[in-house]
């Protein structure tokens, strides 16, 4: 089912984005 893999990849993508934003925030503070 392609929808399941899409949402799984999307949540992984969001986690990566959040992690990168967090690293940027740590550097800036």
UniProtKB/Swiss-Prot annotation:
Keywords: Hormone, Secreted. Disulfide bonds: none annotated. Induction: Produced in the A cells of the islets of Langerhans in response to a drop in blood sugar concentration. It is found in: Secreted. GO terms for biological process: response to starvation. Signal peptide: none annotated. Its main location: secreted. One of its GO terms (molecular function) is glucagon receptor binding. One of its GO terms (cellular component) is extracellular region. Pfam families: Hormone_2. Belongs to the glucagon family. Promotes hydrolysis of glycogen and lipids, and raises the blood sugar level. This is Glucagon. It comes from Platichthys flesus (European flounder).
């Amino acid at each position: 089912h392609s929808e399941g893999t899409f949402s799984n990849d999307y949540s992984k993508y969001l986690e990566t984005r959040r992690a990168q934003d967090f690293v940027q925030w740590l550097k800036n503070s």
